[in-house]
UniProtKB/Swiss-Prot annotation:
Biased composition (Acidic residues): 169-179
Transmembrane segments: 238-258, 259-279, 285-305, 347-367, 373-393, 446-466, 473-493, 513-533, 545-565, 572-592
Molecular function GO labels: ubiquitin protein ligase binding
GO biological-process terms attached to the record: adult locomotory behavior; calcium ion homeostasis; endoplasmic reticulum unfolded protein response; negative regulation of gene expression
Protein name: Wolframin
Function according to Swiss-Prot or TrEMBL: Participates in the regulation of cellular Ca(2+) homeostasis, at least partly, by modulating the filling state of the endoplasmic reticulum Ca(2+) store. In neurons and glial cells, has a role in maintaining neuronal function and integrity during aging.
Residues carrying sugar: 694, 769
Compartments (UniProt record): Membrane; Endoplasmic reticulum; Mitochondrion
Compositionally skewed regions (Basic residues) per UniProt: 144-157
Keyword Transport: no
Main location: membrane
Region described as Disordered: spans on this chain: 139-179
Length: 853
């Protein structure tokens, strides 16, 4: 017991003091306070146990150190930094560290101060919301987070001082009881997942690591609830709740596009890539690469937009932990980690963007829907710009993003292709050169003008973005803004080949996709009105228009009343569909039962023949015969003429001749070669029947026209009965050889010698349909390139590019042509395509300062 003692008077008055005769009561009080969660008391007890200031009779010395470590771990979890330092010292010395607590000590020491503070805030939050229960509901947590977020927005908007902010915070209830279970709807109970303290502590750890807490999947913080419009009929959701409708549509579209790689299995993706590698030719490869890179760009952009929406949720979590934590909460560091952890879609985007720019000049314009691509890229440009303008927590948009976008538009806009700007808006004519241009090297031009000045101002703006927040603005502002500028470049490139009607068509198509349900609902409402008015047979046009407007207004009002009524809103959609389909059938049925005459709307378009080609760039037959054919034929020593004529290889020619012989010179089948050389027999037989067809089915003939048709069929029937083999001949790639006699017999008679020479035309697989219909004696006009001209060959060889029938027996023969780049080898052609793509990429990045021609 404590008693008062008084010292003897010595002339100086001293303080009275307590004499604690029983210190066990004080130790019990300390233990009780420490068990209640006081970090300072836990630290003091641990320090006294380590210093042997407290001797507990029931514990040995080793167990006493172990208990001190347990107190230090508890104090460290509660945010006591001195306890962390002492715990680290104990771990290094091995004092109190056992096999049971070593893992827990390591995890505690591995945590950052911010993570420990966040975990402490999570425990306090759960204790506040649970009121002693073992769990809380997502609705409680969501309501608390929304309340704190709205309060922080009001504080930022009003810019109040701390005292007023704290007074406002005191008005908010800190703790709230659990919901009354009987009042909760059964459907909500089934879909709701209860949250325990372990869930919140795990969420705090994920938050500190810059990862979205898994608990966030059960919450709807920055987006409306997906079921918020389920009580409204489908056709009336945009009419009654337009903002929620478009918001839900936006987020559902993002989720759909983002989930595409997860929906398509990996085996299917690999099979598609293998098929593309097999079937893609040199001209198909750029087309496939373009659309593949464009799809990756769209997917990566949607993934970025999804990350931006998640970042808003992450900031709400920051506000939650800041409101319940202390000064050790590292909200800025956690947010920067979250942005860095989600940089992978940006890498995919820029790689696909570079590939898209490289292959764009290699793709034929006929294979690209420029107007649709312009609308899509333009929409993504403005969406990404609007999202990046509000990357910070400020209410006003980021002025630097707007200025940078405007400067890029002024610098990259194709003024020379816009008639309105070039003829009327002379004050925007930035193409006037103010400095002289300089030619640097082969095909590189350095020029300075007003657009160049704007272009040089762009890096300054980008550096200003990157310098924000101690260079954290690189991934907060700069990289998202570069995505906007990339889509702007795609929009400008595709808009140069688009048309006004094409852009209108694409815009209406995009609007139709977004507004399909509302438009269909309006049509379903108005079709019965049109049928009813049409059945009345009103003669007066004014009466007809007035009755139509009145009936439409009544129908719309009546349908809205039925949609708002709870008793009828479940059946209004089905009733509307049935009525619309019935009335549409009544309108269409008379026209379907009538007979129509199909008249051609368009005449056959005339085709330009080979006669329209210029002969200035080609080698005429008379000159070739005089230089090569005649000397090689007449001179006994042909070496000199052969060497000279070999220099003509690659020169284009346009000649006319008579067909003498047509045959197949070469057959290639990549699939058959792979199966025959690299696969076992049983697997090869299976793949031949899977990808090919039966020989008897492949062989087709007409007994009336072919006398040996029946004999061939019997042979194949017997062969199939014995082996059951299949063929892959439909995968064959043929090269044809046409022997054509070129020359003029009339001039030969006058000169006393013949000027005709046999020329071999080597035709590509694409000429198969044309060559099969040729007959001996047909006169053709062909365009091609000389190949191995009179060198190591008996006849002149020409690689066929275009052939036109002049006098042929078959009436189906016209003109056949292939478009191929003249190059020394396929590898040279691919290198030329690659150089064109790289020049286009460099022009997109450096033009107009440096131009690669």
């Amino acid at each position: 017991m404590a008693t008062w003692t008084q010292n003897e008077p010595t002339g100086v008055t001293k303080r009275r003091r307590w004499n604690l005769e029983d210190r066990a009561s004080l130790n019990k009080l300390k233990h009780h306070i420490a068990e209640e969660g006081c970090p300072q008391m836990q630290y003091d007890l641990a320090k006294e146990l380590l210093d042997n200031s407290i001797v507990e009779p029931n514990l040995a010395k080793g167990n006493q150190s172990q208990k001190a470590v347990n107190w230090l771990v508890s104090a460290a979890h509660n945010g006591h930094e001195d306890a962390v330092k002492l715990l680290r010292q104990c771990y290094n010395d091995g004092s109190g560290i056992t096999a049971e607590n070593t893992d827990e000590v390591r995890r505690c020491l591995a945590m950052t101060p911010g993570e420990r503070a966040a975990r402490k805030a999570a425990r306090e939050l759960f204790a506040c919301l649970s009121n002693g229960n073992e769990h809380i509901t997502p609705k409680q947590l969501e309501r608390k987070m929304r309340r704190i977020y709205n309060l922080q927005r009001k504080r930022r908007r009003r810019d109040d001082d701390r005292s007023s902010s704290s007074s406002e915070g005191e008005q908010e209830p800190e703790c709230e009881p659990l919901e009354d279970v009987p009042t909760i709807d059964l459907a909500n109970v089934e879909r709701r997942r209860l949250i325990t303290e372990a869930h919140l502590v795990s969420a705090a750890s994920n938050y500190s690591a810059g990862q979205m807490p898994s608990v966030n999947d059960a919450l709807t913080l920055s987006v409306p609830d997906p079921r918020s419009l389920d009580h409204v009929p489908c056709f009336y959701r945009m009419i009654f709740h337009p903002l929620i409708f478009f918001t839900l549509f936006y987020h559902r579209l993002l989720n759909l596009i983002v989930s595409i790689p997860n929906v398509i299995p990996l085996s299917v993706r690999c099979s598609v890539l293998v098929a593309i590698s097999w079937w893609s030719s040199r001209h198909m490869l750029p087309l496939v690469s373009y659309y593949l890179s464009l799809g990756i760009m769209i997917w990566a952009t949607c993934k970025m937009l999804k990350t931006k929406q998640q970042f808003v949720d992450f900031r709400i979590w920051s506000g939650l932990f800041l409101s319940y934590g202390d000064q050790n909460i590292e909200a800025d560091i956690a947010e920067h980690r979250f942005l860095r952890n989600n940089m992978k879609p940006y890498l995919y985007f820029f790689c696909a963007f570079i590939c898209n720019l490289i292959v764009y000049p290699l793709v034929t314009d006929a294979w690209l829907p420029h107007s649709e691509l312009t609308i899509i890229s333009g929409a993504l440009t403005f969406i990404t710009m609007c999202v990046s303008m509000y990357a910070s927590s400020h209410q006003l948009p980021d002025w630097l993003v707007i200025v940078s976008f405007a400067v890029n538009v002024l610098a990259k806009y194709p003024y020379e292709m816009d008639e309105v700007v070039s003829t009327r808006w002379r004050f925007l004519d930035l193409r006037v050169p103010t400095f002289s241009s300089f030619v640097i090297g082969n095909g590189i031009e350095f020029c300075l003008n007003c657009r160049t000045a704007l272009y040089l101002f762009i890096p300054v703006l980008l550096i200003m973005m990157a310098k924000r927040s101690r260079w954290h603005g690189v991934y907060t502002f700069l990289i998202p803004h570069c995505v906007t500028l990339s889509w702007l470049q795609v929009c400008i490139a595709t808009s140069q080949s688009s048309t006004v009607f094409g852009v209108m068509r694409a815009a209406l198509g995009l609007a139709g996709i977004v507004l399909f349900l509302p438009l269909f609902g309006i049509v379903a409402l108005l079709v019965p009105v049109f049928v009813a008015i049409d059945s009345l047979g009103l003669a007066s046009e004014q009466l007809r228009w007035g009755s139509t407007a009145l009936a439409c207004g009544l129908v719309v009002v009546l349908s809205c009343i039925l949609a708002l009524n709870r008793a009828t809103q479940k059946y209004i959609t089905m009733l509307q569909l049935i009525t619309a389909i019935t009335t549409a059938c009544l309108l269409v049925l008379p026209y379907m039962t009538s007979s129509f005459k199909d008249t051609p709307r368009f005449n056959a378009m005339p085709r330009a023949g080979l006669h329209s080609l210029s002969e200035t760039n080609t080698l005429p037959w008379d000159r070739f015969h005089a230089l090569c054919a005649q000397p090689v034929h007449e001179q006994p020593n042909k070496i000199k003429a052969q060497l000279r004529c070999s220099l003509l290889n690659g020169m284009p020619v346009i000649w006319e001749g008579s067909v003498t012989k047509v045959e197949i010179s070469r057959v290639s089948n990549f699939l058959e070669d792979t199966i025959a050389n690299y696969l076992p027999v049983w697997l090869g037989r299976m793949l031949r029947c899977l990808h090919g067809e039966n020989i008897s089915q492949h062989f087709k003939c007409d007994p009336k026209l072919d006398a040996q048709c029946e004999e061939w069929r019997s042979v194949f029937k017997t062969f199939n009965a014995q082996s059951g083999s299949c063929t892959l001949q439909r995968w064959n790639r043929y090269e044809y050889e046409l022997l054509v006699k070129v020359g003029t017999k009339r001039s030969g008679r006058l000169l006393g010698r013949s000027t005709t020479t046999d020329v071999i035309l080597r035709a590509h697989h694409d000429f198969g349909n044309f060559t099969r219909l040729l007959s001996e004696g047909d006169v053709v006009l062909f365009y091609g390139i000389l190949h191995n001209s009179r060198l190591l060959a008996d006849n002149v060889q020409v690689k066929l590019k275009t052939i036109e029938c002049v006098e042929c027996r078959s009436r189906d023969l016209g003109t056949a042509s292939i478009e191929r780049v003249v190059a020394a080898s396929p590898m040279d052609a691919r290198l030329q395509d690659l150089m064109r793509g790289i020049k286009y990429l460099l022009n997109a990045l450096l033009n107009p300062l440096i131009t690669f021609k």
